[in-house]
Amino acid sequence: MRRSVLQLKTVKSKKIEGGRDAAIFEEHLKSFEDEGMFKLAHIAYGFNPGAVLTGNIVEDERVWGSTEWGIGYVSPFDAPPHGQDAKSHCDGICLNSSVWLDGVQIMDEGRITDPYLKELAAFRE
């Protein structure tokens, strides 16, 4: 399994690690010559027990235990009043994600660890 890490500080990418794939992705973002391409646009947590990985982002971003990360441009409609300027936008799906928010782990390899969220997800796990 290939592992890449996108480390964020505030809304801007601080570090992209993970070997060859991460280096290629970082070079792709740098090729736009736009700092906006290193800004977080959105994150979605996959909590749909019926979703499966199909190659269609509309379903893929909902796969249980995944996270979907958007980087770059955000329209003014989605982030009023001005949006987030960038030359492009890209999304990436991470399966079996581990997530920390403000130093607290809420997901570990796709399993919910936060007590409140775990109670909400009891039917699934």
What do these predicted regions represent?
Residues 1-125:
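Metal/cofactor-centered catalytic core regions of large enzymes
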